[in-house]
Design a protein with these regions (language model features):
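Regulatory sensory/coupling modules that transmit signals to nucleotide-handling catalytic cores
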Residues: 1-228
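Conserved metal-coordinating catalytic motifs of nucleotidyl cyclase and c-di-GMP turnover enzymes
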Residues: 237, 259-262, 304, 369
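Short regulatory alpha-helical coupling segments
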Residues: 242-258, 269, 286-294, 312
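Conserved nucleotide-binding and Mg2+-coordinating catalytic segments in signaling enzymes
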Residues: 229-247, 261-275, 283
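A short pre-motif secondary-structure segment
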Residues: 298-301
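Catalytic-core segments of nucleotide cyclases and related cyclic-nucleotide turnover enzymes
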Residues: 320, 354-388
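Catalytic strand-loop-helix junctions within cyclic-nucleotide turnover domains
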Residues: 310-321, 338-342, 349-365
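Alpha-helical scaffold within the catalytic cores of cyclic-nucleotide enzymes
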Residues: 286, 318-339, 349, 368-370
């Protein structure tokens, strides 16, 4: 499993699943000694932090998910300010139904940032829902009166419609995560689960507030996790990024060797077949690189059509052999246009390799490797050249 997929699958449980699990442990064991006032403060602090992070990183989906949770929590709290009779019963049912619906819709939506059109349309949609809930709260529906106690919210989850709604939403959110494997999709699932537990615990009070705090933390942390993925992984090739490569070089133990691979005539593929074919070629070469390195080696996209790998403990000759084996496999591959099966020509790579010298700077090592790559290009391409020891 490549580095991107490992990190992506880890995000199914980290941080959302772990945060919710820790909350459950603290509540069930009685170790949560925070006062209700402090929990309320943490809830609003987490909400504010989530809003700021979502705005700063242009994550409108998470921003509006936090807004949905805030509106739902406020609605549940408001209904307990007076007699909880039939109309409030209907409004609570609507609130509990609308939260999973909105989470699914936000998960299915494309991330469009905070453009005026997307913000206004989403706010209007949420305003209409809020109006419906308010209208239900004022309507004279003939529902059985409910006692003024938080414990009477939990039975709403026993409704077959509520169970079906949460079940369908949970399945859809999990499917979205499996398809996309991104932190936001995982956060929607775990945050919705925490919301269900908040409602099940009564909707208001110390336990419910703890679950609402967890909801906000899960969504806020998903933005940080997404930022990490964008900084340290290349989404196109699923390889680690240049930053991850450089950070590894700063911490790796000697001896080690590196290889730089450059796709021959890459511009020709882009100019002849279009950028989509160029991206396909890049993904194919990245796949051969990832499959061809040894256990413990690191492959990364360094920039453009240039890929690099670090081979810890490898001599210059071992590095050359590994790189040349990858080069030969790429040259022997048959690359075709997706959908039509049209062959797009032979793809070849040129490779330069170098071994770290004691006392050598990172920049000097990369420069020697680039010089070896240049020699490979000058030698007719589709070959591997080792830098002078």
């Amino acid at each position: 499993m490549d580095s991107w997929n490992k990190t992506a699958w880890k995000s199914l449980f980290v941080p959302g699943g772990i945060l919710l699990f820790l909350t459950l442990i603290l509540l069930k064991t009685g170790w949560l000694t925070v006062t209700p006032a402090m929990l309320t403060f943490l809830y609003y602090a987490g909400l504010l932090a989530g809003f700021l992070l979502a705005w700063r990183f242009h994550s409108s989906r998470v921003f509006f998910a936090l807004l949905v949770l805030f509106l739902a929590q406020q609605a549940i709290g408001l209904f307990f300010s007076g007699p909880l009779r039939g109309p409030a019963h209907a409004a609570l049912e609507a609130t509990i139904f609308l939260v999973p619906l909105n989470f699914v819709l936000l998960s299915l939506a494309r991330e469009r940032g905070f453009t005026p059109a997307s913000v206004s349309s989403t706010l209007i949609f949420l305003f209409v829902q809020s109006t419906i809930v308010a209208a239900l709260a004022r309507a004279g529906q003939d529902y059985p009166p409910m006692a003024h106690a938080p414990s009477h919210v939990a039975p709403l989850l026993s409704s077959p419609y509520a169970r079906m709604g949460f079940g369908i939403a949970a399945v859809l959110l999990l499917i979205r995560f499996v398809l996309l494997r991104k932190p936001a999709e995982s956060a929607f699932f775990w945050s919705l689960t925490s919301f269900v537990l908040a409602v099940h615990s009564g909707g208001v009070g110390r336990t419910a507030t703890a679950y609402f705090v967890t909801c906000t933390m899960i969504l806020a942390f998903s933005i940080i996790e997404t930022s990490y993925l964008l900084a340290y992984h290349d989404e196109l090739t699923t390889l680690p990024s240049r930053r991850a490569f450089q950070d590894t070089l700063l911490s790796i133990a000697v001896p080690y060797s590196i290889a730089v691979l450059d796709i021959d005539h890459f511009k020709r593929f882009n100019d002849t077949y279009g950028h989509q074919i160029g991206d396909q070629v890049l993904r194919v070469v990245a796949k051969y690189l990832q499959d061809g390195i040894r256990e413990g080696d690191l492959a990364a996209r360094y920039g453009g059509e240039e890929l690099m790998c670090i081979l810890p403990g490898a001599s210059l000759e071992i590095c050359r052999q590994v790189a040349d084996r990858i080069r030969a496999r790429v040259a022997g591959a048959r690359v075709t246009r997706r959908g039509t099966g049209q062959e797009i020509g032979q793809v070849t790579i040129s490779t330069g390799v170098a071994q770290f010298k004691p006392g050598e700077s990172f920049e000097a090592l990369i420069e020697r490797c680039d010089e070896a790559l240049y020699q490979a290009k000058q030698s007719g391409r589709n070959c591997t050249i080792a830098a002078a020891a």
